[in-house]
Each structure stands twice: as C-alpha cells, then as structure tokens.
Amino acid sequence: MKALALAAGLIGMAFAATAAEHRIVIDGMAFTPKLVSARPGDTITWVNKDMFVHNVTAAAAGFKSGDLKPGQSWRHVLRQGESFDYLCTLHPVMTGRVEVGDTIKTARRRSTS
C-alpha cells in the first residue's frame, strides 16, 4: 500500500513539474494572446488590466469566471481534450481560444518549417 501511495505521489510530482503557466491579459477590450496552445495540467490565468469589468465564459468547457473587476484575475487548470472557445459575455466581441493537447506545439512547428 505504501508503494502505491509513493508511486502516485511521484507521478503527481512529475506531472506538476511539467505543467506550465499561461497568462492572458484583458486590455483594450481584447484578450491577448487571442490563441493559447497548452497541455493538460497547464494553468491559464486571465488578468483584467482594462478599465472595465469583464468575464471569461466557455460554455463548452462548462465554466464562467464571474465578473473580474480591473486588477482582478482568474485561473483555470486544463484537462485532457479540453480545447475551447471563450468570450466575455458582457462584451461578446471579445473572444479567444485555448487549444489543449500533447502534440499541438509539435504539429505547429512542423507546419511552419
């Protein structure tokens, strides 16, 4: 039983060590960058640097940040197969996309070579 707990802990540590942080800035009535490529376990943080209240809503992924006042931020940890489009429901012209997968970055590098 102890060996199983140790193995689970080591796997969790390895997973956490490879997870990345991605930052999306909300400013000028836009999300920047508009497209983020990430892996399962990565964290996306949206930071509101605009002078208006915004939110981050992804119906397909089943989340809504709630209202983010200027200076506030919100985080979401990505799961496998969780690519999604999102928007600010207060300002629907503000949109973005997060693509989640282990091979996204590799495939993009190959296509630009």
Each model region followed by its residue ranges:
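Positively charged n-region of N-terminal signal peptides that target proteins for export
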Residues: 1-5
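Hydrophobic h-region of N-terminal signal peptides that target proteins for export
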Residues: 8-18
